[in-house]
């Protein structure tokens, strides 16, 4: 069952869902809570690597990722981050979100930004039950013009769904959780995947 605005507010007031900084009532409407852009970004740097072999040995994958990803970029609150057409960048939400083991969250971009060509998440829009931390955004500019993105701007919305029961393996309890207590624009940790798995 998807939570409506009054249920979202109740869950926040009762501490079942935590969003820090706490959203204003005006930011909760229908079935969503507005979220804002943080000030940390990562981009792909100029590189000579022809490809990244995602099925290769962990050390080799990590070395390739270190070659192509920038260090974290911090943008001042009065400055903008410019995303050019055809570019992918990682960003982070201003808000940190904590969910209990029986609620899954969903991230959606804003229609107004999509109409300018901005994708807020490339594919990863689920926030697992038991999640705690900032949410990394995978920005892609599919439009024709550079987009100036300013920290603090409204960037998307979260909705929440109550599951049939508490998860047996919530995110915060998983040993293999690569982004536990995430802060900042964390780069891909795909090198931490179990390469022996057939799933």
Swiss-Prot record:
Residues at the active site: 138 (proton donor/acceptor)
Superkingdom of the source species: Bacteria
Keywords assigned by UniProt, alphabetized: Hydrolase, Nucleotide metabolism, Nucleotide-binding
The EC number(s) this enzyme carries: 3.5.4.13
Catalytic activity reported: dCTP + H2O + H(+) = dUTP + NH4(+)
Pathway entry: Pyrimidine metabolism; dUMP biosynthesis; dUMP from dCTP (dUTP route): step 1/2
Gene3D superfamilies: 2.70.40.10
Class of enzymatic activity (EC top level): hydrolase
GO molecular function, one term: nucleotide binding
Binding site for dCTP: 110-115, 128, 136-138, 171, 182
InterPro entries in the cross-refs: dCTP_deaminase, dUTPase-like_sf, dUTPase_trimeric
A biological-process GO annotation: nucleobase-containing small molecule interconversion
Subunit comment: Homotrimer.
Family assignment from sequence similarity: Belongs to the dCTP deaminase family.
The protein's role, per its UniProt record: Catalyzes the deamination of dCTP to dUTP.
HAMAP family membership: dCTP_deaminase (MF_00146)
Name of the protein this chain belongs to: dCTP deaminase
Upper classification of the organism: Bacteria, Pseudomonadati, Pseudomonadota, Gammaproteobacteria, Alteromonadales
Record gene name: dcd
